[in-house]
Amino acid sequence: MNIKPWIQAARLRTLPLSVSGIIVGSAYAYYQGFSDWRIVVLALLTTLGLQVLSNYANDYGDGVKGTDANRIGEKRLVAAGIITAEQMKMAVIITSILTFIIALLLIYVAFGKENFALSLIFILLGIGSIGAAIKYTVGKSAYGYSG
C-alpha cells in the first residue's frame, strides 16, 4: 500500500493551525502553574485526529457528491480516483475510532474517575466534534454546502 496519497489526503498544511489553540492554551496553563505533559500530548493528538478526520471526510463527501470533479488547484484524491470512495470511507471510520479512543484517554487523564459528570460532558462534546467533522460535507444534510 502506498502511503503517499493518504498523507496528501490528510492535508498536512492544515495541521499547524489546528494545534495552535492547544499550544497557546498549554503555554498559558504552564504559565499559571498548571501543566501536565500527558494532557498536552493527548490534546495535540486529539486535535490532529479531528483535523485529519475532517480532511478525509471532506475528500470523501466532495468526491462522492462530485463537488471536486472540476476543482482548480490541489486535487482531491477520491475525485481523482487515486483513493476509492470505499477506501476513504473506511479511513474516516478508522480515524473516528482512533480519535475517540485518544479523546477518552485525554478525558480520563484530565478529569480522573472522580469527575464523572464533567467527563461525561466532554465525552458528549467529543462525539459531537467527530460528528461535525464528518457532517461538514458527508450526507444529505451536510452543513458545508449551506450558505
Predicted regions and their residues:
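Membrane-embedded alpha-helical segments that form the functional core of polytopic membrane enzymes
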Residues: 24, 32-57, 121-134
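Residue-level signal for inorganic ion chemistry
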Residues: 10, 62, 84
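Acidic (Asp/Glu-rich) catalytic motifs at the cytosolic membrane interface
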Residues: 49-74
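Short amphipathic alpha-helical coupling elements at transmembrane boundaries
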Residues: 5, 66, 76-80
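Intramembrane alpha-helical segments
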Residues: 76, 80-147
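Generic alpha-helical secondary structure signal
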Residues: 1-2, 18, 69, 73, ...
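Topogenic membrane-insertion module of multi-pass membrane proteins
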Residues: 1-42
